Amino acid sequence: MTRYCRGLSQRQAFLLLTVLALLFILLFVVKDPRAKDSRCQFIWKNDASAQENQQKAEPQVPIMTLSPRVHNKETTSVSSKDLKKQEREAVQGEQAEGKEKRKLETIRPAPENPQSKAEPAAKTPVSEHLDKLPRAPGALSTRKTPMATGAVPAKKKVVQATKSPASSPHPTTRRRQRLKASEFKSEPRWDFEEEYSLDMSSLQTNCSASVKIKASKSPWLQNIFLPNITLFLDSGRFTQSEWNRLEHFAPPFGFMELNQSLVQKVVTRFPPVRQQQLLLASLPTGYSKCITCAVVGNGGILNDSRVGREIDSHDYVFRLSGAVIKGYEQDVGTRTSFYGFTAFSLTQSILILGRRGFQHVPLGKDVRYLHFLEGTRDYEWLEAMFLNQTLAKTHLSWFRHRPQEAFRNALDLDRYLLLHPDFLRYMKNRFLRSKTLDTAHWRIYRPTTGALLLLTALHLCDKVSAYGFITEGHQRFSDHYYDTSWKRLIFYINHDFRLERMVWKRLHDEGIIWLYQRPQSDKAKN
């Protein structure tokens, strides 16, 4: 009995130990999964880190992220409409990034989007390295009222800019995108619109009755007339920074959409103009004189005017385009000091008026040529002129002659002057800003060649007389003084004749120029 009880106690002890061992094993099994999960988690983190490092080492591809507006608060699914919208925003964002690389940071117009119209205009500061050349201070812009009443300085106007929300492409994939006129529904106005190249070494006139002196005292002109603005473009004034700046303006007021290689090739052939004020520089040292100039337009008002001798009595005579002289000497004179033209106006004049005697430009060792560069065809004209080739493969292919033939192969580059785009834009902005620029037809507008020539004379001469320009009662006269039969003056949309007529009248009324006007009872022969 005693043995049985002792054996039972041993078995109980063994069972107790077994139970304790099982409990210990159970406790270990319960704890072990946590330790295993933690290790798996560590391994996963290492794998994720390795993948992340691998992604960083590989070339980055632009990733389109969804705007917060696309996500719904309760779900992350996106409709196809939203995806298409986001794709458009991504493309616009990439374009905006490309434009930001320009050295000149600008104000861009807002895209056609109802939401963007409600946003305020974003103004971007101008780059500090616009150009080494001095700039004209102040800024002018358009007004709701016509500028023909005097181009009074107004508050600066800039176009609206809105950047689309999208991720930026990799720096190595960015490309500088060129501006295109088709991107704008009206003329773009940049925050550096009114900055012009100035000639700080410009000669000063000693004539107390000079246009420049009168302009400085005129309430209308004193804030808009720049007597020392750069007039001419040459090899010394063509730089990369100038190209970057002027590429924001459409020709003839800049280089937008032009071929930089072509422009550089021809412009750098022209020697630097030593003195912008050519006529003042021609005066003997210490000589005081008021330089008088006659600017002769081609208007029918000159037919039977008998002012030819009066025109020739001026120190310098400016003519333009189809300047027919033979047979009209009594009406328009015979002398020519400056001849203004565009490649198109010159080729057209030779083609149409060749039988009337205008077969080449006015010739003479003292004649200077003023070329107003309208666009690509003008630079193609210059290239063909330097190569002494025809214009067969250009925008003027219909003109069968070599450009040098128009100058009778006696061209002297010292007397061939290119008008600076800054100067042309200045004349447009401050004197002849048409309402057309605020419409979809903005790209084709420019002042007439005669208007550009007259305003050029205002910046070269002391006293200016204008003949053959549009005036009140122009309906009485034919389009041109050399017309053999009466032709009505047609107001094409690419010019603003009414604006020019009002500006010439105001300049005349303020004594800035003298404008030839026929009495109301007079009529031309034709």
From Swiss-Prot:
Residues 81-106 have a biased composition (Basic and acidic residues). Glycans are attached at N206, N228, N259, N303, N388. Submaxillary gland, mammary gland, spleen and colon. Changing R319Q: Knockin mice display compromised mucus barriers, dysbiosis with reduced bacterial diversity, as well as susceptibility to intestinal inflammation. Residues 161-171 have a biased composition (Polar residues). Belongs to the glycosyltransferase 29 family. This is Alpha-N-acetylgalactosaminide alpha-2,6-sialyltransferase 1. It comes from Mus musculus.
